[in-house]
Amino acid sequence: MDISRLISLFSKLPGLGPASSRRIVLHLLRHRHDVMTPLANGIRELEESTKECEICFNLDVTSPCSICTDSRRDKSLLCIVEELGDLWAFEKGRIYQGMYHVLGGVLSALSGVGPEDLNMSSIPERVRLHGVKEVIVATGSDMDGQVTCHYIAQSIKSTGVKVTRLACGIPLGGEIDYLDEGTLRAALSSRYII
């Protein structure tokens, strides 16, 4: 692989443009043995050992994942998040001890993303079969996040389960993954029924 192709591949990562990618590639080339080789091996091992959880769609080394198999977690709470980074934000803050469901995105008419493109079809069954008493919809506050929230609420309405949404602390158009722990804690504690 030539250097320019590797720079182009790094540029596809979030937050990295051509200049940052070039600096990273040059650093890797200068530090082949102590940085590049362990990084390449780590990426290869990660690719081989990571599995998508068959229940919540988290990524882990086992399926079901360590969250879904943890007997200390509150199985009556189900927090639905857009992306894996949102789940990790909750876990990092240690502010939530229930179960998760990772959608893999949000509904978006403009982008052509419908319910069949997301991990949505198993939500009603999870709610019915696993003793869920409250579903917390933790999607972003932008239009697509709100539409997704409404769709989820309608899809489980017949179960009679309480459906809540994160409240204060999340700015309009904000992304959960970028919130600090205090803001996320405030939003979780002041969620409201939808």
From Swiss-Prot:
Domain Toprim: 76-171
Zinc finger (C4-type): 53-68
BP terms from Gene Ontology: DNA recombination; DNA repair
Pfam families for this protein: RecR_C, RecR_HhH, RecR_ZnF, Toprim_4
Keywords for this protein: DNA damage, DNA recombination, DNA repair, Metal-binding, Zinc, Zinc-finger
Molecular function GO labels: DNA binding; zinc ion binding
InterPro entries the record matches: DNA_Rcmb_RecR, Rcmb_RecR, Rcmb_RecR_Znf, TOPRIM_dom, TOPRIM_RecR
HAMAP family, A to Z: RecR
Family label: Belongs to the RecR family.
Function in brief: May play a role in DNA repair. It seems to be involved in an RecBC-independent recombinational process of DNA repair. It may act with RecF and RecO.
PANTHER family the UniProt entry points to: RECOMBINATION PROTEIN RECR (PTHR30446:SF0)
Protein name from the UniProt record: Recombination protein RecR
Organism listed in the record: Anaplasma phagocytophilum (strain HZ)
